[in-house]
A protein has these predicted regions:
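Active-site-adjacent beta->alpha loops and helix N-cap segments on the catalytic face
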Residues: 3, 75, 101-106, 122-129
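Catalytic cores of alpha/beta
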Residues: 30-33, 101-113
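Alpha-helix-loop-beta-strand connector modules within alpha/beta enzyme cores
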Residues: 65-91, 129
Length: 129
């Protein structure tokens, strides 16, 4: 099944009254494992990547100093891998950017293949957040 947006998965939780976990993954093997466990329970899987993980997956060893280009490359790399797993899976799989640091990081994730993003404005002044 192709990657799906987050909204339908969350709508189902409201409609049927259940909780849905979301799991941060920092490596392709972790993504594969999360999907495999969700398949066992026949439950949708929400995989989350963060800016730092995207920089790391983009080849940046000192990922805390990752550039936007590192994040773009990493978002593409993780999305391509997760898409392959999702296409072979009978369950819905969401790829979500968790705590995007800024607008550009969110755009990089969307362009890379993420199906959901969250921008973290907690470092901004209250009025801007």
């Amino acid at each position: 099944m192709p990657l799906v947006p987050l909204r339908p998965v969350l709508d189902a939780t409201v409609k049927y009254g259940y909780a849905q976990g979301a799991f941060n993954v920092n490596a392709v093997a972790q993504a594969e494992a999360v999907i495999a466990v969700h398949e066992m329970f026949r439950s949708p899987a929400i995989l989350q990547g963060a800016d730092l993980a995207n920089a790391f997956m983009g080849g940046r060893v000192d990922f805390a100093n990752g550039t936007l280009e590192d994040k773009k490359k990493g978002a593409r790399n993780i999305a391509e891998a997760v898409k392959k797993f999702a296409e072979q899976s009978p369950i819905p799989v969401v790829l979500h950017l968790d705590h995007g640091k800024n607008f550009d990081s969110c755009v990089a994730a969307i362009e890379g293949g993420y199906t959901s993003v969250m921008i973290d404005g907690s470092s901004l002044p209250f009025e801007e957040n």
